[in-house]
Amino acid sequence: RELLMGIFEKNGTGKTAAFVIPLLQK
């Protein structure tokens, strides 16, 4: 979770969400 939050802040929420959400839905 902490790693994910760091990635969100680094790359921008919208961009990262589009990449992470599909993984979470697997």
UniProtKB/Swiss-Prot annotation:
Every Helicase ATP-binding domain range: 11-26
Main subcellular location of this protein, as a coarse class: cytoplasm
Residues binding ATP, per UniProt: 11-16
Disulfide bond residue pairs: none
UniProt KW keywords: ATP-binding, Cytoplasm, Helicase, Hydrolase, mRNA processing, mRNA transport, Nucleotide-binding, RNA-binding, Translation regulation, Transport
GO cellular component, one term: P-body
EC number: 3.6.4.13
One Gene Ontology molecular-function label: ATP hydrolysis activity
Location in or out of the cell: Cytoplasm, P-body
Catalytic activity: ATP + H2O = ADP + phosphate + H(+)
Record carries keyword Secreted: no
Keyword hit for Zinc-finger: no
Top-level class of the enzyme under EC nomenclature: hydrolase
Sequence motif Q motif, residues: 1-10
A Gene Ontology biological process term: mRNA transport
Domain notes: The Q motif is unique to and characteristic of the DEAD box family of RNA helicases and controls ATP binding and hydrolysis.
Function of the protein: ATP-dependent RNA helicase involved in mRNA turnover, and more specifically in mRNA decapping.
UniProt record similarity statement: Belongs to the DEAD box helicase family. DDX6/DHH1 subfamily.
Record-given protein name: DEAD-box ATP-dependent RNA helicase 1
Classification of source organism: Eukaryota, Viridiplantae, Streptophyta, Embryophyta, Tracheophyta
